[in-house]
């Protein structure tokens, strides 16, 4: 029996139960998977028609093993955690108060800057493979990478305003401006991505909901997997994933998760999907325009490998999954006022 740390179940009709010290996945009379609980770190249910017993849920929550639910197109719709993972009162009070103080704005700006820097870096990284084969495309990608950094400067200028320096500026005062800056950077990023990807995929540009093309479908599914890891990191750091800053609070909307995920999208998902595409991964779709089960499993495997890969961070090498947890704790300490700044993850390839 191999060691399973991240259990994914996506077969219609599958049933997850607990037996002794293991989770057992069966479909009818066929035993599909046995996962020893001692090694298990998370459970991902990624299709409809999958059932799980109350005993399995209880055992997972008692052991601190989160259970995530995403649809077959990658849209997350539920998570189960231990009732004890609700964070400290001090951390959550500081988080709620930060929405009305300069602290929340400082966090939003840092995350936004980190996201754009990573987008710029990824375009630059992808361009180097075109230097000899397509010099014109190489120059175009380099230009777009530089233009994204111009938007970083635009974001940084907000911190030079007198009202920011005095501490009186609030997120609500500049929310639309920040979203506009990020949107203009995203336009350049996806314009570059479209030129990087093989034409046979027919990438139309970024489509979030209702995507029917293979690249957007793969990205959305990958983001759904990443979403669960991000939410888990925030909960373990004592933060409320539903109380964000840039994304407006709405019932059932995990706005802090949506804020925090931004600096990791290019690093954890985009690079993986673009790399797979440039190696001619078929990203097969079914008759309804959705990713096939086999394609979803391959994407999940590649995203998991990426999360387990090490990258430089704070002078050492850490698995990307661990860095997410470290960064979530940095967010918590920053909001509590124990750190003067929050430094986003910035990848150098």
Q: Which residue stretches match the model-derived regions?
A:
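NTP/phosphate- and nucleic-acid-binding module
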Residues: 24
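Active-site helix-to-loop segments that bind/position phosphate- or nucleotide-bearing substrates
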Residues: 1-19, 28, 35, 62, ...
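Core catalytic machinery and nucleic-acid-binding channels of phosphodiester-processing enzymes
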Residues: 83
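Short hydrophobic alpha-helical runs that function as membrane-insertion/retention elements
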Residues: 43-45, 65-71
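A short acidic, amphipathic alpha-helical/loop segment
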Residues: 55-59
């Amino acid at each position: 029996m191999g060691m399973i740390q991240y259990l994914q179940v996506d077969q219609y009709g599958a049933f997850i139960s607990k037996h002794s010290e293991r989770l057992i996945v069966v479909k009818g009379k066929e035993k599909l998977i046995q996962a020893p609980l001692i090694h298990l770190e998370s459970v991902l249910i990624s299709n409809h028609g999958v059932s799980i017993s109350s005993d399995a849920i209880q055992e997972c929550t008692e052991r601190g093993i989160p259970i995530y639910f995403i649809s077959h197109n990658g849209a997350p719709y539920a998570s189960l955690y231990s009732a004890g993972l609700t964070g400290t009162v001090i951390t959550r009070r500081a988080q709620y108060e930060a929405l009305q103080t300069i602290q929340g704005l400082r966090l939003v700006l840092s995350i936004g800057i980190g996201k754009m820097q990573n987008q710029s870096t990824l375009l630059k990284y992808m361009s180097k493979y075109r230097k000899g084969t397509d010099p014109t495309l190489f120059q175009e990608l380099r230009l777009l990478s530089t233009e994204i950094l111009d938007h970083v400067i635009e974001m940084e200028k907000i911190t030079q305003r007198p009202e920011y320096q005095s501490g009186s500026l609030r997120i609500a005062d500049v929310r639309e401006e920040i979203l506009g800056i990020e949107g203009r950077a995203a336009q350049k990023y996806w314009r570059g991505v479209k030129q990087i990807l093989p034409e046979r995929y027919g990438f139309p540009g970024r489509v979030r909901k209702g995507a029917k093309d293979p690249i957007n479908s793969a990205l959305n599914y990958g983001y759904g997997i990443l979403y669960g890891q991000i939410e888990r990191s925030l909960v373990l750091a004592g933060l409320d994933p539903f109380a964000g800053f840039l994304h407006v609070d709405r019932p059932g909307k995990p706005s802090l998760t949506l804020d925090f995920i931004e600096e990791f999208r290019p690093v954890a998902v985009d690079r993986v999907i673009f790399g797979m595409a440039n190696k001619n991964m078929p990203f097969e779709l079914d008759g309804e325009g959705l990713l096939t089960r086999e394609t979803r499993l391959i994407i999940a495997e590649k995203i998991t490998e990426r999360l387990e890969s090490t990258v430089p961070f704070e002078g050492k090498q850490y698995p990307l999954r661990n860095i997410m947890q470290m960064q979530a704790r940095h967010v918590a300490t920053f909001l509590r006022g124990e750190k003067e700044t929050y430094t986003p993850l910035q990848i150098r390839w």
